[in-house]
Amino acid sequence: MAEKNTEEKKPLADKVSGFLAKYRVLFIGVIVALIIVAIVWGVISSVTTSSHQKGLNQLDSIIYTLSKADEASVDTARDVALPQVLELAEKNKGNIVGLRSSMAAAEIYFSQEKWGEARDCWLAATTTKNAGYTAAVCYYNAAVCSEELAEVDLAIDYYKKAISTPDCEFESHLLFSLGRLLEGKGDYTAAAENYSNLKDNYPSDSWTSLAESRLIALKAEGKIQ
């Protein structure tokens, strides 16, 4: 009963923070879907060779077939799609087909909870010449995979790389993630710096409310001044 009462007394922001930390992987597919749409529209004018267009069409066909699989057959469909996508990625290193194929392979590996393989594919996607469109989200997902592998230091490194990319559109989320991991490591000063940076630069952001709650908690616990 005491445990239940303690849980009920937790601030709403702390509960939301815990929920997002626990289920952050559920949001990745949405982010990637939006990014891929942006890629298609952003680079369509630059896809001038028939080989690139053919590769994109092949990839779209593979992904479409995979998306039509029902729950009973989706595992088999992933097993069929993955080598095809990996082959496209290997044959098209450095161009838009390779970029999208690496991201698609990463999504499949991620759905299979193969965190190391997924991370490798996310990182491969950052090496193409078109990576500016997607580097931030790829580094973010590499960080999440690293968290799943309990490799916190690598996760911190990839979150920092995501923040440093020129086209990062979700820095507030990344700052909170960094603060969360640093706090978990016991580096409360560094965690507070990220929370404060979030508070100062994104005062109206939803992540700022969570950061403020952590700053209050850290001060109340005497972990920061």
What are these regions (language model features)?
Residues 1-35:
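N-terminal positive-inside, membrane-proximal cytosolic segments immediately preceding the first
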Residues 89-98, 112, 128-135, 162-171, ...:
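Short solvent-exposed coil/turn linkers within tandem alpha-helical repeat scaffolds
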